[in-house]
């Protein structure tokens, strides 16, 4: 399944994309009319949090089938053209990110490949698909992109052994880890350079892990104004998904809705000769196999 959060008519909701339809099933409305018992999560995060007691996907499937059988299916669907995409997990939880997890990317920035380089991104930096974000020219002329696979955590745990780590994964999404390279080079910590307003575009969907059975063998392609900048594969990750979860959970308790950004392949603007940073009016597209394309616009 592909889940998303969105705004429609000034109301925040969440839903599911079914098959090849260019519309979202509004699960807030579907559950209001067709939920089994008291299962009626008001947000996608609430659905993930209740997944340990009731199979969230199965409850969604049953409710959508009931809506289809009602003869009023169209009343519960909204065209993608009419919605504003929000970060898939809304309200947002923790975003924990790994840097230098692709050797070629570390090399292009002249960084040593370290065993563990972790930072967080502020919740206020999150935005959804098709968002227009500030160009931040008032503070930097080195705005950069990083296309990444995001892991969506599905259940709580800490000190999770590698052998069990994938049991804690609910699904995957796309992240563009927008970075102020100027601040990154001047500061000892990464939080500020990674937490600009609009600096964490995410989405458009969460794809459940059953629909992405080989997440460590998917292509990541980033285009700026239709020019391919990054063309990598998650198979190039230094720490694999189970290792990332094991490492983080040694120190941080993970909870449903937490997002782990797994690092970016080579091809960022700062690594080019000469560097090619994002400019006002640019369009950035990050595509990952079987998830979709995350589009971001830099304001003029």
Swiss-Prot record:
Keyword Transferase attached: no
UniProt superkingdom: Bacteria
Recorded GO MF terms: acetylpyruvate hydrolase activity; metal ion binding
The entry's keywords: Metal-binding
Residues engaged in binding a divalent metal cation: 146, 148, 177
Entries under InterPro entries matching the protein: Fumarylacetoacetase-like_C, Fumarylacetoacetase_C_sf
Family note: Belongs to the FAH family.
PANTHER family with a match to the protein in the record: ACYLPYRUVASE (PTHR11820), ACYLPYRUVASE FAHD1, MITOCHONDRIAL (PTHR11820:SF7)
UniProt name for this protein: Uncharacterized protein SAR0930
The organism of origin for this protein: Staphylococcus aureus (strain MRSA252)
